[in-house]
C-alpha cells in the first residue's frame, strides 16, 4: 500500500450524506480503519465505477447474465460389451476459488438428455447457468454411460471455469474427457448469452404433400436450428409421425430466449426428414425464416426445398409447411395458475414407527401436552398454517405409516383418525392429539406406499381445464428401509404426477438418506438408471429451525412454486382465464 490511498464511496437509494470519518492505519499488508475525515463536498462520485472487491459476500456486485451451454462429444470410450455407450452429461458447479477446495460440495446445475448407442453424441438439451463476471465459477462436466440395468458407468469428466469458456473465441471450448488420468473422449462446449424476455413462444406446424421417401409414404420429423457464430445450433427435434405425408404436429412451447436468444430477427432453419429404422434418415427439405416473420403472419406457409433436386426441370418443391398457430405468451407465474383456478390439495403423513418412542413417554417425539408441544405438532402448525390457505376446499387428508393395524400387520399407509380428511390445520392437530396415544407403534419406516398413494390420488381428474396440484407433507423421525422402492416411486411421480413431496425430519437422526431424496446435490435416479425429470422433493430438518417456525415454513416450501410451474409446463398446461 502506498502512502496515499483511494477510498471509493457509493450511495444507494435516497441516502443523504455530507461527511464521513474513516480511520486508516497499516500493519504489514493489513489496512486497519481508525481515523480519517473526508469532506464529501469535495469528492466526485463516478456513477459508472462499478468496481468492488469480488470476495465481498452478500453484496450483488453485478447483474448476472444467463448463459446457455450446449454440448457434443467425440470418440467416447465404449463402456458396453454388446452395444455402444448411452452417454449423458451432468453439469456441476463447485463454489469457491479453487477446484481443489474440498470444503464445498459440487452442486448439480443440470443435465443433457441420454443418447442411446452413440460414441459421438450431439446433445439437443442445453444447460442454462447464471454467469457472474466477478466470481470464479468452477464447472465439472461428468459424462456417464447410463446403464438401464443397474449402476451407471463413469466415462470421464472435464473441468473448467465458466469464465474460461466465455473468454474463448466463439465462446467455444474443446477439452479432453478423462477417467483416472486417461483420456476417454473429447467434449465440445459452446456458450451463448441469452436475453431473458419473460415470454414463451407457441408453434404448431402442419405439413402438406411431403415427398414420399419410402415406398408409399414417409415418416416425417423436423429439426429447428438457430444461427450462431459457430454454425447452426440445434434447438428442437420433433417426434416422428409414421406413414403420413400430411403430418399435423402437436404444439411446441419454448422460452423465447431458448428459441432465438431473444433476437426476433435471428435466422432459423427448419429441416424435415424421413425417419428410417435401419440406416440414415432421408432429407426431405428445409426452409429459413425468422421469429419476427413467423409471428407477424406475413408468411405462414413455407415451401420445403431440397437443393439436390433443384437442377431437375420438373422439380417444384418437396412439400409445404403451414404454421397453424404462432404466438407469444408471457411466462406464467405461480400466482397466474392459482388465479386461473388451479386447486392445491394438501396431504399430511405422520410417522408412527416405534423409534419415535411411546407417546406417553416424556422422551417420545410424540409426547404432546398442552404445556409441551411435540416436534410433530409444531411441524404441523408451522408448515400447515402456510399451506392450508392455498388448499381450495380446506380438506386435508391425514395419513399414518409404520403402525400395527388389524391382525397385527404393520401398515405403511393408513387413514389416520376416524375421518379421511380434516378441515383445516386446527382439526388436523386435534385429530393427531386424540389418535396418536391409541396407535400401536411398529416398524420399519417405509415411504413407498405413502408416495404411491399420493401419486395415484394426485392425477385423478387432472387436465388442462381442471388443474390440480398436490403437496404431500411427510413428518418422520429417521431413515427409511425401502430406499430403492421409494426412489422408484419418486422418479415415476416426477414425470407423471402433479405432486410435490415435503419431508420434515423430526428428532436428532442424521437424515442422510432424506438428503439424497432431496436431489439438490445429485439428480435422483432409480436402479434402472431412469432419472427424475423434475426435482419434487424438499427435505428440512426440524431441529435446525425449531426456534423459528416462520423460517422452517419458508425453507420447507420455497421450492413449491417452481415445482408446480415445472409440472404445468411439462404438460403444456397454461393458466386458465381468471375468474
UniProtKB/Swiss-Prot annotation:
- The domain of life for this entry's organism is Eukaryota
List ligand-binding residues for Ca(2+) 2.
80, 145, 147, 153
UniProt lineage: Eukaryota, Amoebozoa, Evosea, Eumycetozoa, Dictyostelia
Name what cofactor the protein needs: Ca(2+)
Q: Would the keyword Ribonucleoprotein turn up in this protein's UniProt record? A: no
* Boundaries of every VWFA domain copy: 345-552
- Which UniProt key words apply to this protein? Calcium, Metal-binding, Repeat
Q: Does the record's keyword annotation contain Repeat?
A: yes
* Residue sites binding Ca(2+) 1 per the record: 80, 86, 145, 147
**Name of the featured protein:** Copine-E
Residues of the C2 domain: 45-175, 183-304
For this protein, the record's Pfam families field holds: C2 (PF00168), Copine (PF07002)
Q: Name one GO cellular component term.
A: plasma membrane
Q: Which gene holds the coding sequence for this protein?
A: cpnE
Single GO biological process annotation from the record? cellular response to calcium ion
Q: Which PROSITE patterns match?
A: C2 (PS50004), VWFA (PS50234)
Offer an example of a GO molecular function term for this protein.
protein serine/threonine kinase activity
What does the sequence similarity comment in the record state about its family?
Belongs to the copine family.
The UniProt entry, under InterPro entries, shows: C2_dom, C2_domain_sf, C2B_Copine, Copine, Copine_C, VWF_A, vWFA_dom_sf
Amino acid at each position: 500500500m502506498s502512502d496515499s490511498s483511494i477510498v471509493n464511496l457509493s450511495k444507494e437509494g435516497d441516502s443523504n450524506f455530507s461527511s464521513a470519518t474513516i480511520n486508516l492505519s497499516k500493519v504489514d499488508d493489513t489496512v486497519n480503519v481508525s481515523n480519517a475525515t473526508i469532506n464529501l463536498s469535495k469528492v466526485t462520485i463516478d456513477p459508472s465505477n462499478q468496481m468492488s472487491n469480488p470476495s465481498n459476500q452478500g453484496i450483488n456486485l453485478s447483474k448476472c447474465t444467463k448463459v446457455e451451454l450446449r454440448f457434443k462429444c467425440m470418440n467416447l470410450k465404449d463402456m458396453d460389451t454388446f452395444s455402444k455407450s448411452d452417454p449423458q452429461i451432468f453439469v456441476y458447479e463447485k463454489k469457491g476459488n479453487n477446484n481443489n477446495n474440498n470444503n464445498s460440495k459440487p452442486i448439480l446445475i443440470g443435465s443433457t438428455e441420454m443418447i442411446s448407442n452413440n460414441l459421438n453424441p450431439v446433445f439437443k438439451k442445453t444447460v442454462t447457468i447464471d454467469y457472474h463476471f466477478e466470481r470464479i465459477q468452477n464447472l465439472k462436466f461428468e459424462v456417464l454411460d447410463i446403464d438401464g440395468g443397474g449402476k451407471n458407468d463413469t466415462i470421464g469428466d472435464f473441468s473448467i471455469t465458466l469464465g474460461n469458456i466465455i473468454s474463448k473465441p466463439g465462446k467455444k471450448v474443446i477439452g479432453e474427457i478423462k477417467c483416472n488420468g486417461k483420456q476417454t473422449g473429447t467434449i465440445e462446449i459452446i456458450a451463448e448469452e441469452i436475453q431473458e424476455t419473460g415470454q414463451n413462444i407457441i408453434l404448431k406446424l402442419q405439413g402438406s404433400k411431403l415427398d414420399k421417401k419410402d415406398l408409399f409414404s414417409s415418416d416425417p420429423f423436423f429439426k429447428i436450428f438457430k444461427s450462431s457464430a459457430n454454425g447452426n445450433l440445434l434447438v428442437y427435434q420433433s417426434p416422428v409421425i409414421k406413414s403420413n405425408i400430411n403430418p399435423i404436429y402437436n404444439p411446441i412451447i419454448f422460452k423465447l430466449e431458448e428459441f432465438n436468444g431473444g433476437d426476433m430477427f435471428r435466422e432459423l432453419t427448419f429441416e424435415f426428414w424421413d425417419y428410417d429404422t435401419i440406416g440414415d434418415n432421408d432429407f426431405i427439405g428445409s426452409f429459413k425464416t425468422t421469429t419476427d416473420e413467423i409471428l407477424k403472419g406475413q408468411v405462414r406457409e413455407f415451401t420445403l426445398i431440397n437443393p439436390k433436386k433443384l437442377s431437375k426441370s420438373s422439380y417444384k418443391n418437396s412439400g409445404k409447411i403451414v404454421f397453424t398457430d404462432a404466438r407469444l405468451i408471457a411466462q406464467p407465474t405461480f400466482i397466474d395458475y392459482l388465479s386461473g383456478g388451479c386447486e392445491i390439495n394438501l396431504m399430511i403423513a405422520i410417522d408412527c414407527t416405534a423409534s419415535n418412542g411411546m407417546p406417553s413417554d416424556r422422551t417420545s417425539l410424540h409426547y404432546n401436552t398442552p404445556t409441551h408441544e411435540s416436534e410433530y405438532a409444531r411441524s404441523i402448525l408451522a408448515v400447515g398454517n402456510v399451506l392450508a390457505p392455498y388448499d381450495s376446499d380446506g380438506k386435508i387428508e391425514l395419513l399414518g405409516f409404520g403402525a400395527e393395524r388389524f391382525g397385527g400387520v404393520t401398515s405403511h399407509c393408513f387413514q389416520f383418525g376416524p375421518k379421511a380428511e380434516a378441515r383445516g390445520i386446527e382439526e388436523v392437530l386435534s385429530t393427531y392429539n386424540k389418535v396418536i396415544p391409541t396407535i400401536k407403534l411398529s416398524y420399519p419406516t417405509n415411504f413407498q406406499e405413502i408416495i404411491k398413494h399420493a401419486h395415484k390420488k394426485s392425477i385423478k381428474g387432472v387436465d388442462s381445464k381442471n388443474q390440480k396440484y398436490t403437496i404431500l407433507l411427510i413428518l418422520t423421525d429417521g431413515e427409511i428401509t425401502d430406499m430403492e422402492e421409494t426412489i422408484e416411486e419418486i422418479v415415476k411421480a416426477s414425470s407423471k404426477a402433479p405432486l410435490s413431496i415435503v419431508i420434515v425430519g423430526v428428532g436428532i437422526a442424521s437424515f442422510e438418506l432424506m438428503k439424497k431424496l432431496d436431489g439438490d446435490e445429485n439428480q435422483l435416479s432409480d436402479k434402472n438408471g431412469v432419472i427424475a425429470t423434475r426435482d419434487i422433493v424438499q427435505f428440512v430438518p426440524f431441529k435446525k429451525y425449531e426456534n423459528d417456525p416462520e423460517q422452517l415454513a419458508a425453507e420447507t416450501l420455497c421450492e413449491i412454486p417452481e415445482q408446480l410451474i415445472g409440472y404445468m409446463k411439462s404438460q403444456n398446461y397454461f393458466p386458465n382465464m381468471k375468474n
